[in-house]
Amino acid sequence: MTPKRPAVAWVPGRGDVIWIDHNPQAGREMKDHHPFVVLSTAGFNRSVGLVVGCAMTSAAYNRGSSLAIDLGPIPGRPDAHSFVLCHQLKSFDWKARGARPHPLARLDGDKLEQVLEIVGQILGFLP
């Protein structure tokens, strides 16, 4: 009889879209449960217990913003789009905030690269 392997605990990784609680918040920061795209690696997230990434929203006023990546229509809501807010870069204790996978699952390579490029420009890593 083959021994059962222990279940591998879920750890979010770069490009994953997760649900996370943004509260508490202040000022113009995102609040409540929202999707969040993870930019940090699974190894970092596992060892440090934090995720670094960007908030996501469906607020239409983000359309056309140079700081928001339009991911396209939301399934079942053709008039609403999902946006990654590259200027809402945050780190969260993903376990304490009850992070869980989002139905979008992952950003495709091109969209993730766009997010990383804008974040790099904001932080001065890229020209």
Language model region names:
Residues 1-127:
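Conserved functional hotspots at enzyme active or ligand-binding sites that engage polyanionic ligands
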